[in-house]
């Protein structure tokens, strides 16, 4: 089940998370690359240090996603789509993520096992 999250309330949804998010990019072959990232808010952007692979992938394909795991079993994960820009200064790389869409998501209990629906997603507005 997914619940949309309004971008105007995203900072509150992020503040409720107890774990660091994973930043999801894709490499030249389309394979996913995931890495944990420490982020802070700067205006409307989420900003944090990133590695070489993330910088390379994000520069080539700036449409990325962030995934915050649920705080406890049965809770919602927070999934945020974002546009990534990488600032490079000396040997340091800084990811600047501008959120474009966000949802809370969790698997749903399937009331009828003969159906294909197996998720309980809700947009966060």
Language-model features and meaning:
Residues 1-20:
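Short, basic/aromatic recognition patches
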Residues 51-113:
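Short, structured beta-strand-loop surface elements
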Residues 111-125:
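Short, cationic low-complexity segments
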